A protein has these predicted regions:
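A cross-family signal for N-terminal binding/gating loops and helix N-caps
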Residues: 1-237
């Protein structure tokens, strides 16, 4: 218990005091991320720059990273009646199928919980998502399954050409897709950045290699952080 209280004090000391702090786009650069190091043998906790990770590990240790690349999962569309909406993909495409959540008119500058409801749609409706013609296959509240006129590589190309990164109202400017990728991103599988690996920059990875630390990869999806609806958030993968 004494050790736990000490750990809490160290982490709590890093929190800004007073009112809520508005984060800026560059609030913490990848090189400025800090790492909480817990030493159970000495019952100590310290905070160090993340770049010191290679010195904390030993030759033969293994670091496993998630190599899922972040999709441009935010796409804007219209109904046949001209009503506008945003589609946020909730999973990678499968053939010609797109899985996602609809938000009403607006963009990331408005908090998700303050966005208007999306247009009403029904199975069989034809929509236009960016440049992609789709038909509604399933509807469950704001969750939808859409079938596109394109499939596989052609559909991926259109999504990458028209989509942007999902982001939220605490930032004012649109993020480029490269800004939400890890250094080792490979398979397009995450609808938001797998941010635990954000600070694993190339210099840290090279430092791990030089220290004899092994690096292995797996691909694991990262889902939507928020839809503005708590019940829907809990239902998403």
């Amino acid at each position: 218990m004494k050790f736990q209280r000490q750990a809490i004090r160290v982490v709590d000391a890093l929190r800004p005091r007073g009112t809520t702090v508005a984060l800026k786009a560059d609030e913490v650069s990848r090189h400025a991320v800090r790492l909480v190091v817990v030493d159970r043998a000495r019952e100590s906790v310290r905070v160090v720059p993340f770049g010191e990770l290679p010195a904390l590990l030993r030759a033969g240790d293994l670091v496993v990273v998630n190599d899922a690349a972040t999709l441009p999962a935010s796409l804007f569309g219209t109904t046949a009646r001209g009503e506008r909406f945003e589609l946020r993909l909730s999973a990678p495409i499968a053939g010609s199928r797109m899985y996602g959540v609809l938000l009403g008119e607006g963009d990331f500058h408005v908090r998700t919980e303050d966005r208007p409801a999306p247009p009403r749609i029904a199975v069989g409706d034809r929509l236009r998502v960016a440049t992609i013609e789709v038909v509604v296959e399933q509807v469950a509240g704001r969750r939808v399954t859409l079938v596109a006129a394109l499939a596989d590589d052609e559909l991926w190309q259109q999504i990458y050409a028209a989509g942007v990164a999902v982001q939220y109202a605490h930032r004012t400017e649109q993020l480029a897709l490269y800004a939400v990728q890890t250094a080792y991103a490979a398979r397009p599988w995450a609808v938001e950045m797998p941010s635990a690996g954000r600070a694993l920059t190339w210099d840290v990875l090279l430092g791990l290699r030089r220290a004899g630390v092994q690096i292995a990869t797996l691909t694991h999806a990262a889902g939507l952080s928020s839809t503005g609806d708590d019940a829907l958030d809990r239902a998403l993968p």
